[in-house]
């Protein structure tokens, strides 16, 4: 049996989970169709998902249709969970991108489609909610061609809420023959030579074009009234093809981890090549660590079943493997989809338990959530000792807060969400602290040179000290101290885009230790940074704004107020497209503002594009309870020279 892995993607409230539930029901995988409003869906299994009607974690289920097993990955639709969506892209054979016929193309829709297009993932576009009042499909078709792709093939006509095929294996409209000829040289040559071309020839060519992500079929339906679902199933099993297996050697990718109510760890793997068998002893990540498969499940027709073997391109579930982490692979390293640029969160907030004695419980709970979602980054502020969580947005914060309370029984309070800034030295400086020169209490001399690098370069560390003079353990201690120092600069933000050179060293044998060098390094670094001064860097977003021509003046005024850098403006009689860069801090809520002042017609799409020197205000990230006395003494001694 052929097996395919299909992603279901959509903007929030496009009906993604409802479509998935209908696919399960129509294929016979479930006896009734789950409803988001009733909280009885298969894919949204978490209590918080059922209650709020949104998908938080990617979930996997399975159906069989036309002799093809289709593993369906239902992904979050909210931008705050984009990291969860990005992880699923690596394992997809194809995707269904769902649009709402009423709301049309949203910023998230375009972002998802651009990624699918970039990664060349075969994609079917499904227009849901065609039953809604006020739907204008002709305008939506124009929007699809203008904002997604010209290479779309509308497979059906919609008449009075019903769908009728206009392109199939036995029939194809004349204008679609021309479309296929324009996309395939072989068919074009046969057409120009007046050779006979059957509807099946055109159909098979369309299948090949979709498989190469050169053409995107468009279907219609309504999940609420089960319209167009069977046709969508037929399209999925026709257009999304299974990959060819290249080896019999086991290769698998761990894409999801969850914990059941009893705390058992459940790991989901896609078997890329070969097979995984019960009682196999397999290697993790080509390391020296081996594990034995003591239990093995797969998903069949919406249900998990115990099996002895899971074959290529199928999903395996293994329980109670403590060493597993998302991104691990078993066996040979798999060839996965490349080209994803992971988006790092640019917001943060401090979190504290309502009861201070439950702090360790919060840390343990956050660690469990991190195992399930590696994009969840939390740390302890070295100055304030507060727990800090990096965030993608407000919705993610609310979900984390609810999970901590309901799943781990600990109530927490989040402080104000802040933008994550960074720091960079302004100029090249050199600083030395000498051994046995007060107030230096360490048996070490360290000299460091700091110099700024171009934005986006990151941290570079070099050493001018010979390993013949100062061995690896001492120098590694200095490098560790530098990395630790870069975690918090003069304003408490990460220091980046700089080169730090270890320029001078002295030690006394046998009293000097690596610990002396490790502990002295942050003081040398801090004094050098104070001498240099820092530029504050703020996160920037690349934006594309599409609004009706009548709203262009307001849009440009808004962008100027947000201190954006407009790179391109193109307008016609109806629409205006504006591209450029804008600070995240000034544009956090602008997508909803655009939707409001354009009555839902405008689209504000953004993606991270690095950091640049801030033009406006910024906030510090330091909450020092007491001053570092030794640093104060170093500063005083330096100022007296």
Swiss-Prot record:
A molecular function GO annotation: GTPase activity
Residues annotated for GTP binding in this entry: 10-17, 74-78, 128-131
SMART domains for the chain: EFG_C, EFG_IV
Residue span, tr-type G domain: 1-244
InterPro entries referenced in this protein's UniProt entry, alphabetically: EFG_II, EFG_III/V, EFG_V-like, G_TR_CS, P-loop_NTPase, Ribosomal_Su5_D2-typ_SF, Ribsml_uS5_D2-typ_fold_subgr, Small_GTP-bd
Keywords: Antibiotic resistance, GTP-binding, Nucleotide-binding, Protein biosynthesis
Function statement: Abolishes the inhibitory effect of tetracyclin on protein synthesis by a non-covalent modification of the ribosomes.
Stated family: Belongs to the TRAFAC class translation factor GTPase superfamily. Classic translation factor GTPase family. TetM/TetO subfamily.
Name recorded for this polypeptide: Tetracycline resistance protein TetQ
Source species: Bacteroides thetaiotaomicron
Gene this protein is translated from: tetQ
């Amino acid at each position: 049996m052929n097996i395919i892995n299909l992603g279901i993607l959509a903007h929030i409230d496009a009906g993604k989970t409802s479509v998935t539930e209908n696919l399960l029901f129509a294929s016979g995988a479930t006896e009734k169709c789950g409803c988001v409003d009733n909280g009885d869906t298969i894919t949204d299994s978490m209590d918080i998902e059922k209650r709020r009607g949104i998908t938080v974690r990617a979930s996997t289920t399975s159906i069989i249709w036309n002799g093809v097993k289709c593993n369906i990955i239902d992904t979050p639709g909210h931008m705050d969970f984009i990291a969860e969506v990005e992880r699923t892209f690596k394992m997809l054979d194809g995707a269904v991108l769902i649009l709402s016929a009423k709301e049309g193309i949203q910023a998230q829709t375009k972002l998802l489609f651009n990624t699918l297009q970039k990664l060349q993932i075969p994609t079917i576009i499904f227009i849901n909610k065609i039953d809604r009042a006020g739907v204008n499909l002709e305008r939506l078709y124009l929007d699809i061609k203008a904002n997604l792709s010209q290479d779309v093939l509308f497979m059906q006509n919609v008449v009075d809420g019903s769908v009728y095929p206009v392109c199939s294996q036995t029939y194809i409209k004349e204008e679609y023959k021309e479309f296929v000829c324009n996309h395939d040289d072989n068919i074009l040559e046969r057409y120009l030579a007046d050779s006979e071309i059957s509807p099946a020839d055109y159909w098979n060519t369309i299948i090949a074009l979709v498989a190469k992500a050169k053409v995107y079929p468009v279907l219609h339906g309504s999940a609420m009234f089960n319209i167009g679902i069977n046709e969508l199933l037929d399209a999925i099993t026709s257009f999304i093809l299974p990959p060819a297996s290249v080896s019999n050697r086991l290769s698998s990718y761990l894409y999801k981890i969850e914990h059941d109510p009893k705390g058992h760890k459940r790991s989901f793997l896609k078997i890329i090549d070969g097979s995984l068998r019960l009682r196999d002893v397999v290697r993790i990540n080509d390391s020296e660590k081996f594990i034995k498969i003591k239990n093995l499940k797969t998903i069949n027709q919406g249900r998990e079943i115990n099996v002895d073997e899971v074959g290529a391109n199928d999903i395996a579930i293994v329980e109670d493997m403590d060493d597993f982490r998302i991104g691990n692979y078993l066996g040979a390293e798999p060839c996965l989809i490349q080209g994803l640029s992971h988006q790092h969160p640019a917001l943060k907030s401090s979190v504290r338990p309502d009861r201070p004695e439950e702090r360790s419980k919060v840390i343990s709970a956050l660690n469990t959530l991190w195992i399930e979602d590696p994009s969840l980054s939390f740390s302890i502020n070295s100055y304030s000792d507060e727990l800090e969580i990096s965030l993608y947005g407000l919705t993610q914060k609310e979900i984390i807060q609810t999970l901590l309370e309901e799943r781990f029984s600990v109530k927490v309070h989040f402080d104000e969400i802040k933008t994550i800034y960074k720091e960079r030295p302004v100029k090249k400086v050199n600083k030395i602290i000498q051994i046995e020169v007060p107030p230096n209490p360490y048996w070490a001399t360290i000299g460091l040179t700091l110099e700024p690098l171009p934005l986006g370069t990151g941290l570079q560390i070099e050493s001018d000290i010979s390993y013949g003079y100062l061995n690896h353990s001492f120098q590694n201690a200095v490098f560790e101290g530098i990395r630790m120092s870069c975690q918090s600069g003069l304003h408490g933000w990460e220091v980046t885009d700089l080169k730090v050179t270890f320029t001078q060293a002295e030690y006394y044998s046998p009293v000097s230790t690596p610990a002396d060098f490790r502990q002295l390094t942050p003081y040398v670094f801090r004094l050098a940074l104070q001498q240099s001064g820092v530029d504050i860097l703020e996160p920037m977003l690349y934006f594309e704004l599409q609004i009706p021509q009548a709203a262009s003046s307001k849009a440009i005024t808004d962008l100027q107020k947000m201190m954006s850098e407009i790179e391109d403006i193109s307008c016609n009689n109806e629409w205006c497209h504006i591209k450029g860069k804008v600070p995240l801090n000034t544009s956090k809520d602008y997508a909803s503002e655009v939707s409001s002042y354009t009555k839902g017609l405008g689209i504000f799409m953004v993606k991270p594009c690095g950091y640049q020197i801030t033009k406006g205000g910024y906030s510090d990230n330091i909450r020092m309870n007491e001053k570092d006395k030794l640093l104060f003494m170093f500063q005083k001694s330096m100022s007296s020279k």
